[in-house]
Amino acid sequence: MPARNHTKWKQVPGQLEVGEYVSSKIYSDENIFKKEMNTIFRNVWIPVCHESELPGAGDFRTTTIAGESILVVREEGNTIHAIKNTFERRPRGNMGPEIGFQDSPKFYHSDIKFGGFVWVTLNENPPTMDEWVDGSFNCMKESLNAEPLDVFHYHKAIIPCNYKLWHDTNSEFYHDYLHFHNRVTGFNDSYFARENKCFNNGHVNVGSFEVQYDQYEGFESREELSFPYLPTNHWEMIDMFPGINFNLRGSALRVDVMTPLSPDKVMIEFR
């Protein structure tokens, strides 16, 4: 069969009209990327770090949200502030006894929630954190708040892809079929019985799942290692819009935060 040209493709019945499909330009177009930064990322709450990463007065971390440089610092009174970063080039450190951020041209709304994570938004009139998460943390909130948490590992990677592609890998499970080890040992009835529960503002909670560690070759049950109030060997996961993942499994919590750098580049911070 000869290849179809544009005219022949236009004659194929059942074609979608413009507006009936999502263009692949959403992964590469610079103007779409800029619009996403302004209309999405400037209006959402982002967990920029954990309070344990700012243990003392003057300790700070820098980050960016929607291309805007942010400095998060703990002051003498133990309060944590998020301000516009106009002077600090280090990614983290201590500002010394003269903290001197009071003259910052911009303070951002911030809150410490859900296990001590420092959330920041550029939105000048934001919803409260509870309004923003809309109950999506109910599955793990009690476990995260039971005892003080501490970041014991940090990893950063820059991935050459659009941020939406990365978030998709945390949101779907069809790629599990490509993993031989998972095909043989990981699938059972409860794996497919999970329910994806959707919340306002684009968040999704993947239903609880009991991980059968003792079924993996070389592994054993982890019943003695578990977060408070979390059933033994259980796993909970929250995919938060537009690119945040809270993954609670047994005795460890992993949090992934995306920072889009360009249409084809995204930074992932793993804690």
Which residues make up each language-model segment?
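Residue-identity detector for glutamine
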Residues: 11, 15, 102, 212-215
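Short solvent-exposed loop/turn micro-motifs enriched in small/polar/acidic residues
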Residues: 54-56, 65, 101-105, 150, ...
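N-terminal pre-ligand scaffold of iron-sulfur
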Residues: 1-86, 110-111
